[in-house]
């Protein structure tokens, strides 16, 4: 059982919902990424999604695009991201880490080399935004062979056939994009999310995390009531973008702790 699978099994046993925060590696300060990861874990994150900076992040809104641009301007590459995970693992062997990004940096690194290097660094999962499931079976198998969960996106527009295709190759969890468009956009409609989740659950044998548009404890709690986990990214990247450097770590941990309390409150209400 992978570290991600163990985490979700423990959450299910406890009747709790997962909290999956996203930050971009190397932003706003490459020297602080590992410290930010520890702050996320200390605040109550169950899984950490670490963004790999890329020059054309087509699925991301302006907040994460700017974040990626800043990290690239500071020279952050996939190798630096793997080094950050390795440093994080020196003192945290329990919190799963998922790399989220685009195919180009991985393909330039070499898929086989990436699988080996990611595993050696302590990566638990990988979500490649621009790998459609119909074309990702070989990639997914190589990740699983290295002990890494291949994670895929689903959207409101995903057909039953697309959902079933993802169900065949995904492990760890799936990430349901609750809004059409790019990250950080729009307003959440929890009823429409609740209407889509059963179709996913019936075809995908792994937990469902919901993200895009979650900005605060209230929206996180609402989404947690209809999903297995809540994914939050743009709001955290925005927080780090605007926070004073000396207070960024504490602000990040405090915000995650607020979300954690909201999710645990939702779980207690449901019991």
From Swiss-Prot:
Q: In which pathway does it act?
A: Amino-acid biosynthesis; L-tryptophan biosynthesis; L-tryptophan from chorismate: step 5/5
Described by its record, this protein's role is as follows: The alpha subunit is responsible for the aldol cleavage of indoleglycerol phosphate to indole and glyceraldehyde 3-phosphate.
Record Gene3D superfamilies: Aldolase class I
Q: Catalytic activity, per the record?
A: (1S,2R)-1-C-(indol-3-yl)glycerol 3-phosphate + L-serine = D-glyceraldehyde 3-phosphate + L-tryptophan + H2O
Gene Ontology cellular-component annotations = cytosol
Keyword vocabulary terms for this entry = Amino-acid biosynthesis, Aromatic amino acid biosynthesis, Lyase, Tryptophan biosynthesis
Question: How does the annotation summarize its subunit structure?
Answer: Tetramer of two alpha and two beta chains.
A Pfam family recorded for this sequence: Trp_syntA
What is this protein's record name? Tryptophan synthase alpha chain
The lineage's top-level taxon is Bacteria
The record's gene field reads trpA
Q: What is its EC number?
A: 4.2.1.20
Q: Which molecular-function annotations from GO does this UniProt entry contain?
A: tryptophan synthase activity
């Amino acid at each position: 059982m992978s570290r991600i699978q163990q985490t979700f099994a423990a959450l299910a046993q406890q009747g709790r919902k997962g909290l999956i925060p996203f930050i971009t590696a190397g932003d706003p300060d490459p020297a602080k990424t590992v410290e930010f990861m520890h702050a996320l874990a200390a605040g109550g994150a169950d899984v950490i999604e670490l963004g790999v900076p890329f020059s054309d992040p087509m699925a991301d809104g302006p907040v994460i695009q700017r974040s990626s641009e800043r990290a690239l301007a500071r020279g952050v590459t996939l190798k630096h991201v793997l080094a950050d995970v390795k440093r994080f693992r020196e003192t945290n062997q329990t919190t799963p880490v998922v790399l989220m990004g685009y195919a180009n940096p991985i393909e330039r690194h070499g898929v086989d080399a990436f699988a080996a290097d990611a595993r050696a660094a302590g990566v638990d999962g990988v979500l490649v935004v621009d790998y459609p499931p119909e074309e990702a079976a070989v990639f997914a198998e190589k990740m699983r062979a290295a002990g890494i969960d291949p994670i895929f996106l689903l959207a409101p527009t995903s057909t039953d056939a697309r959902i079933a295709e993802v169900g065949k190759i995904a492990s760890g969890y799936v990430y349901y994009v609750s809004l059409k468009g790019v990250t950080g956009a729009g307003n959440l409609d929890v009823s429409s999310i609740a209407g889509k989740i059963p179709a996913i659950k019936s075809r995908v044998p792994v937990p469902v995390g919901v993200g895009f548009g979650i900005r605060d404890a209230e929206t996180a709690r609402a989404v947690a009531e209809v999903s297995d986990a809540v994914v939050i990214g743009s709001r955290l990247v925005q927080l780090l973008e605007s926070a004073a450097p000396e207070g960024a770590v504490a602000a990040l941990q405090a915000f995650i702790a607020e979300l954690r309390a909201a999710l645990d409150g939702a779980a207690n209400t449901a019991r």
